[in-house]
Amino acid sequence: MRIRVFSDIHIDVNSGFPFTLRDKDTFTLIPGDVSGNVKGTAKWIQANIHNGMFIAGNHDPAYNELGWTIQKQKDYLAERFPLDGPVTFMDESVGVMSKTVPGTNILVVGSTLYTDYRYISPFYQECLDDGNVRRVERGEEPLYPEECNKATAVRGLNDFRWGHVPDESDERGLKQRRVCPDDYKKWFDATFSKMSQLVQENKDKDIIIMSHHCPTPKCISERYVNSAMNASYVSDLEKFITDNPNIKAWVCGHVHSTTITTVGDKGQLIVCNPRGYERDMECGDWNPNTYIDTDTWQIATKPFKSKRLDAARKKFKDSFMRWAPFFM
């Protein structure tokens, strides 16, 4: 069997770059960020995917233009794409995190996941260590990666400007507050706990894990390898993967750079196949016709051609090249 995998198509930001699928019946996994709002996500999924599973990214439910909390937006997707339907929305918060691929022994375990904020790049760790030496000399408490990463996330991600959750201080349950990194960490802990349980309970199955956030620093592009923001995109879960050989593949998104790699001696597959933002020309090698061959647990592809998309890309590139000299 072949399972198609792609993510981060961002149809709202990429509205000038039309993308639709012809082979809508191919079994497909989409690890998040179809759109910047859940109604747009639902509409595109219904029109293009007739067989598969998907999860929310940080964008799909984060933007509060509907006045809904993140949870209400996930509930909206869960109602329209139930467990017993041909296309299923998965998330720990809606009580649906696992489903068997029809006619196979493959169990998909899926949820947004979020991040534990523990990962820190070697360069950033050196900077933190140097700063802590001086802090201790001044009699101050040292800083730790998790708290630094959370502070960096608040400054660097729009999630914490636009996403909302219920305000716990309001006894009537009417008020909302902005989501914060502590919420993401809490959701990560709940999701990872359930994920670990499902993996342990299904040793007899081949498991594909689907998350929006990445499970290994190998997914970080070389241009961002020293970024202070990396903990907002990845958690280092390689030991969890290698300790559980029934995890055959992990599909993810979020980082807007294509990664197809393996971890461990058993070659457990990591697949990150995001489209990213067309205006930034992030993933020029993006191919939505990317598949996991479940007989070999290797990647297979076939050529992707779209005259409408190619024409839009050419128009944008020509316009960019015409105006670029004025900004140099």
Language-model features: locations:
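Active-site-proximal loop/helix segment associated with metal-binding centers of metalloenzymes
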Residues: 107-207, 213-224, 321, 326-328
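Charged helix-capping and loop-helix junction motifs
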Residues: 70-74, 226-235
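N-terminal active-site segment of His-dependent metallophosphoesterases
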Residues: 1-54, 60-69
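Active-site environment of divalent metal-dependent phosphoester hydrolases
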Residues: 10-17, 35-40, 59-66, 94-99, ...
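Binuclear metal-dependent phosphoesterase catalytic core
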Residues: 230-248, 256-328
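Glycine/small-residue-rich loop that forms an oxyanion/phosphate-binding "nest" at active or ligand-binding sites
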Residues: 64-95
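Beta-strand-turn-beta hairpins that frame and shape the catalytic cleft
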Residues: 1-4, 95-110, 204-206, 262-269
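Active-site neighborhood of phospho(di)ester-bond hydrolases with catalytic His/Asp-centered motifs
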Residues: 5-7, 28-33, 52-58, 88-93, ...
